[in-house]
Design a protein with these regions (language model features):
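A short, N-terminal "cap"/entry segment at the start of jelly-roll beta-barrel domains
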Residues: 1-19, 55-129, 142, 216-224
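Glycine- and acidic-residue-biased ligand/ion/polar-headgroup-sensing regions
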Residues: 10-45, 49, 137, 147-166
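Conserved hydrophobic/aromatic beta-strand scaffold that supports enzyme active sites
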Residues: 51, 130-134, 152, 177-179
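Short histidine-centered beta-strand/loop micro-motifs
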Residues: 13-17, 123-124, 133, 141-147, ...
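Surface loops and adjacent helix of pleckstrin homology
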Residues: 65, 75, 146, 165-167, ...
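Tight coil/turn sites that cap or link beta-strands
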Residues: 7-11, 57, 136-140, 148, ...
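Anionic, Ser/Thr-rich low-complexity intrinsically disordered regions
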Residues: 82, 195, 200, 207-224
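Short acidic-glycine-tyrosine-enriched beta hairpin
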Residues: 33-60, 125, 164-187
Length: 224
């Protein structure tokens, strides 16, 4: 039996299971305080013991959404599993927001944008009727919900991992669309290692556009 502790509002790595079935056990009293990725499912409530069985070659991740640390037990060594996404790889690194002018020149950003939101892990160029969002390799945006607007995403590059409602989509091809209705979970992870291989999304929205309508239910980048 292998164990680890997960502190409040922290997640472990998104991993890919090996050839054996992985059995995860968590105290029953804590199951209501976790979010779980198991293969193509993103489970946020009514988690049961059977949901913690990870089939061979499936992806998995646990997020502690509670207020106390939890103990996670595994029936075999997970250190041999491939790490697809480490949310905290740059936690203690010096962080600088992208410079919009430099980024524009490097990545041939189309003219006509009316606003820019630059962070250290992503940059968004706002046009009159859509946004272009670039996400840094090995990074993801927070798992979030909106209360006053819905969004439509079109994947334009980078083959991201996308959380859309209670489903997870892996290495998504260009031209794929996702609808994110009001009050539904959504997120994007860039699994690429090449520092120039950004994920690119074209985002459109309906409703009231206001960054303050976001609830970030899992926010490893600590951006508010």
């Amino acid at each position: 039996m292998i164990s680890e502790y997960l502190f409040p509002k922290r997640g472990n790595f998104l991993r890919k299971n090996s050839t054996n079935k992985l059995l995860i056990s968590i105290n029953d009293n804590e199951l209501n305080n976790i979010y779980l990725i198991n293969g193509t499912s993103f489970i946020t409530k009514n988690i049961r013991a059977k949901d913690l069985i990870i089939e061979p070659h499936n992806y998995y991740m646990i997020i502690n959404n509670g207020k106390k640390k939890i103990k996670i037990n595994y029936n075999h060594d997970i250190s041999i599993h491939d790490i697809i996404y480490n949310p905290y790889k740059y936690e203690y690194s010096k962080k600088s927001d992208f410079d919009p002018e430099t980024f524009k020149k490097l990545y041939n950003i189309p003219e006509g944008f009316i606003d820019v939101l630059s962070k250290w892990y992503s940059i968004k160029f706002t046009y009159p009727d859509y946004n272009l969002i670039y996400i840094k390799p090995e990074m993801g945006i927070s798992i979030q919900v909106h209360y006053f607007r819905s969004e439509i995403w079109e994947i334009l590059g980078g083959k991201p991992i996308v959380i859309n409602g209670n489903k997870v989509f892996y290495f998504v091809e260009n031209g794929t669309y996702f609808e994110n209705p009001i009050n539904t979970y959504h997120s994007v992870i860039n699994p690429n290692i090449d520092p120039g291989n950004f994920v690119l999304i074209r985002e459109k929205w309906e409703g009231k556009f206001d960054e303050k309508d976001i609830e970030r239910v899992y926010n490893p980048n600590k951006y508010y």
